[in-house]
Amino acid sequence: MTKNLLTKDGQFVVGENKGLVYVLAFLCLALFTYGFIEAVLNRFSNLNASSFVFLIAFIASILFYRKGNSKRVYIRINSKGIYQDERLVTAWANFHNAYINQKEKAITIQDNFQLVVEFLKEGTTQGGRRNIPLTNTQNKSEEEVLEAVKFFWAAYKNKIGN
């Protein structure tokens, strides 16, 4: 799917999945509203631990809303190289390999995928490795990210004649 959209002069951008983030913000706000209405109907006389959970839901809704409005670009891949948060990780001339890895955590309910980029450090013969986290609310899948890396790497190799 992504391969058809990629061009040698274009770029591949990974940001937030705004629809998902706004749905999460709305659900948290609905949870807070339910708790607030219940507290008002009880005239704030019977506040308990669940009342604080509803307050936390309000804070979460604000955070999700701000995240949805963010213009942050997590990963940018183009003909020059791979960028993380608009900072160059490696140019294609120094690129060696990239793959998807899952960071192991003892207790978690979410995936912890990372894009692992292996490269030569600028001006040296030392290798480097950068683990770029792939969020659960990003607008591109792990497979699409890896496909974009392969596409631009192949385009670079064709450009230099390898």
Predicted features along the sequence, with ranges:
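N-terminal membrane-targeting/pre-transmembrane regions
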Residues: M1-N42
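Acidic, Ser/Thr-rich low-complexity segments on the non-lumenal side of membrane proteins
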Residues: D85-T124
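Generic detection of short hydrophobic beta-strand segments and adjacent strand-loop junctions
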Residues: K8-V14, T90, R130-L134
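A membrane-cytosol interface segment of integral membrane proteins
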Residues: L115-N162
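Alpha-helical transmembrane segments and their membrane-interface exit regions
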Residues: I56-I62
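Hydrophobic alpha-helical transmembrane segments
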Residues: R43-I56
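Hydrophobic beta-strand residues in large extracellular and virion-surface proteins
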Residues: V14, I75, I82, A98, ...
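Conserved beta-hairpin
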Residues: I62-N97
